[in-house]
């Protein structure tokens, strides 16, 4: 029997994935395609399947295995991701999925904001727009505002990566 599996992050499926189709399968038992594509339903179901099956969790290989990993060059936590981030992350995702399909132990580790300078600048500009400055509000209040900004946009960025279908090991964020 010829089997074609939709690649969902791991080829270690053994044909048991609900998205595996067999040439000799009974087509009467197959779900009919909808007339229109409903991305929110489809993408949520697939994203949940990936999470439930641990499709993107890094699995340590033996000491003789050659591992492949990428740490996302962290986007600054200055705002939501833009098209340039999507392109960059897509290229990384292609490399990770290729190596995963080739049987390499893989890890694509997400992260955000490597230095904080850009985030500090954005928060300072916001304070200026509000008619104050970091010096006027004091160090503790400024650190608190910067932390709140970081927490808000870090969540947005991680949620965007998940929505894009990035095959990161999100348990490592």
Language-model segments: which ranges?
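Compositionally biased, low-structure terminal segments
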Residues: 6-8, 22
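N-terminal, positively charged nucleic-acid-binding surface of large information/translation enzymes
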Residues: 21, 26-173
């Amino acid at each position: 029997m010829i089997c074609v599996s939709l690649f969902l992050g791991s080829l270690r499926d053994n044909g048991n994935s609900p998205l595996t189709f067999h040439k000799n399968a009974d087509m009467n038992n197959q779900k009919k395609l909808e007339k229109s594509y409903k991305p929110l339903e489809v993408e949520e179901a697939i994203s949940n399947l990936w999470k439930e099956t641990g499709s993107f969790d890094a699995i340590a290989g033996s000491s003789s295995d050659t591992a492949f990993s990428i740490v996302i060059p962290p986007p600054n936590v200055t705002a939501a991701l833009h098209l340039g981030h999507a392109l960059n992350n897509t290229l990384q995702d292609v490399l990770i999925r290729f190596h995963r399909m080739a049987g390499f132990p893989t890890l694509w580790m997400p992260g955000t904001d490597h230095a904080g300078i850009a985030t500090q600048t954005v928060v300072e500009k916001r304070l200026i727009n509000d008619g104050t400055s970091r010096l006027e509000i004091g160090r503790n209040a400024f650190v608190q505002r910067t932390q709140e900004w970081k927490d808000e946009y870090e969540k947005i960025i991680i949620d965007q990566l998940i929505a894009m279908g990035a095959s990161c090991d999100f348990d490592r964020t």
